[in-house]
């Protein structure tokens, strides 16, 4: 066995993998100690940004990911090139941003003809001739069920629920509940006026003290609406009219 083969064998050794995870865990949790980052067993992290109180459960893998406050990632989920908002719940074995293959015009879907990443060990391409990855944007207060798959380039609005096993291939509007393969809108969580209210107040940007003191109001949207008045469109129009005269 040559030197390169021995190195590859060493890197695949369970003890080496465990040591690498432990060193990374200690390093990141110390560096982000002011953010209370919690890293589970054998979590893999590369080029990520964290908010407050993020939790990464066992076996999760994150590459080029940014997480908002209080967002957690379930067991064995894989996220790449993804921006995630605040208060997002991602279940186990969710797949986000695993890359694309061409399905039009290109004679072959194989990356050996268009990619320089070497997925098949060698490549015929002298340049990256196809955009293999595109950023996924996930809003705030989103729940993604177990084993859901989200395609590259998709934008998920605030308040969305994605059912377990769904395959999301296109953008999802705020507060929609989607499911199926491919995912389709099943219903909305709230009435249109209530959605407009939530998008206006952006409660996820409130400070933690306010959220803690008012957490019981989150049990019923009508209770929250009673204490947080939002001017309707006619009121805003009247106010603008007065300013202009």
Locations of the language-model features?
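Glycine-centered loop/turn positions within well-structured domains
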Residues: 166, 170, 174-176, 184
């Amino acid at each position: 066995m040559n030197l390169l083969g021995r190195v590859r064998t060493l890197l695949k050794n369970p003890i080496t993998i465990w040591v690498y995870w432990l060193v990374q865990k200690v390093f990141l949790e110390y560096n982000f100690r002011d953010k209370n980052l919690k890293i589970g067993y054998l979590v893999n992290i590369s080029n990520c940004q964290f908010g407050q109180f993020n939790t990464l459960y066992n076996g999760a893998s994150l590459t080029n990911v940014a997480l908002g406050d209080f967002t957690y990632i379930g067991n064995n989920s894989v996220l790449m090139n993804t921006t995630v908002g605040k208060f997002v719940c991602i279940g186990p074995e969710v797949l986000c941003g695993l890359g694309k293959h061409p399905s039009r015009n290109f004679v072959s879907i194989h990356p050996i003809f268009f990619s320089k990443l070497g997925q098949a060990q060698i490549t015929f391409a002298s340049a990256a001739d196809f955009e293999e990855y595109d950023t996924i944007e996930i809003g705030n207060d989103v729940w993604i069920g177990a084993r859901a798959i989200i395609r590259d380039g998709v934008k998920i609005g605030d308040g969305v629920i994605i059912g377990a096993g769904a395959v999301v291939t296109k953008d999802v509007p705020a507060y929609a509940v989607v499911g199926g393969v491919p995912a389709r809108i099943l219903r909305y969580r709230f009435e249109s006026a209530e959605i407009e209210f939530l998008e206006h107040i952006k409660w996820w940007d409130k400070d933690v003290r306010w959220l803690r003191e008012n957490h019981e109001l989150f049990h019923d949207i009508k209770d929250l609406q009673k204490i947080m008045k939002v001017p309707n469109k006619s009121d805003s129009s009247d106010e603008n009219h007065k300013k202009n005269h």
